Amino acid sequence: MSKFAIQHAPEQFSELVFAQSDIQRRLEEYAACKRTKPIILHGTYGGGKSTIAKLLVTARDPINRGFWQTINCSNVEQGFLTPIEGTWRFAELLEVEPMCVLEEADLLSRRNQFDLRAFMDQHGGMFIMTTNHLHAIDPSIRSRCDCIEIEPPVAENYLPVVQKILASHGVAMGPQPLLKVLDACRNWRDVLGA
């Protein structure tokens, strides 16, 4: 991610922009700890799934007790859940919700997916998984999760955020020229690079 994109990335769940209000409301319920089922965020590249996952975890743990981990599944090996289990047990002793973000969960091997399913059944807790390929996640895991498709917002959804970013750099532009540029953007990465 570029320095500009990092500088203007959302820092709180409330700063996220969604294409669908029903998905936003559903995820707000997760952020407020009103829902507890594990989540699989799926959709196209650059739709913001990893950012949503990170901000959901920080919303659910606002004082940052640190009982959560983020794992990119592209390079995990057999036994990848062992360190998570230690964190999980300690969190449970303190009566804190253990959480784990599994990015690119579809890249877990079949064996690792079965281990994950068994871990979910044995320990519970909040898993938030991201994937561009929902079909590559075993149906037994999908059935235990709330599978939420994240569609990239459209130009009108991005407009207020883009105007705020431009204003922070002393640039004021009306909506029409910005909408022309934003109409060509397919996702957040395109918007931040425009």
Model feature map: region roles:
Residues 72-74, 146-158:
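Conserved AAA+ ATPase "SRH/arginine-finger" region at the nucleotide-binding site
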Residues 29-71:
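Walker A/P-loop
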Residues 183-194:
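The conserved phosphate-sensing helix
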